[in-house]
Amino acid sequence: MKTAIFTVVLALAVFAVLSFGWEANEKALSEEFTELIHEKEAASETEARECRYFWGECHDHMPCCDWLVCRCKWPITYNICVWNRTFPEK
């Protein structure tokens, strides 16, 4: 009887240690994933600032992409990027 109780207590202790280790590993993976997402967001933000895309607002300091041109469309009071009837070269 004492052996069975000791075995159960020992098994519970092992499970507690394993679950603690698994939780720590899961938290580390979650932090790595969060850092990766933030890096991807930062990279996409810098790419988006290089040029304005179709129907994006444009000015002298915010140029349109190569295959777009900045035009004022009536009745819109600001300039937007529209297609200049060319295709980007790859």
From Swiss-Prot:
Do you know which SUPFAM superfamilies this protein is assigned to? omega toxin-like
Against Pfam families, the record matches this protein to:
Toxin_12 (PF07740)
Got any disulfides in this one, which pairs?
C51-C65, C58-C70, C64-C81
The entry's propeptide annotation covers: 20-50
Keyword vocabulary terms for this entry: Disulfide bond, Ion channel impairing toxin, Knottin, Secreted, Signal, Toxin
This protein's major location comes to secreted
Q: Which GO terms describe its molecular function?
A: ion channel inhibitor activity; toxin activity
UniProt key word tRNA processing: no
Q: Return the GO cellular component terms, semicolon-separated.
A: extracellular region
Give the signal peptide as a residue range, or say none if absent. 1-19
Identify the tissues in which this protein is expressed: Expressed by the venom gland.
Location in or out of the cell: Secreted
Q: Give the superkingdom in one word.
A: Eukaryota
Instruction: Say what the protein does.
Output: Ion channel inhibitor.
User: What information about domains appears in the record's comments?
Assistant: The presence of a 'disulfide through disulfide knot' structurally defines this protein as a knottin.
Family of the protein in this entry? Belongs to the neurotoxin 10 (Hwtx-1) family. 13 (Hntx-13) subfamily.
Protein name according to UniProt: U7-theraphotoxin-Hhn1d
Organism, by scientific name, is: Cyriopagopus hainanus
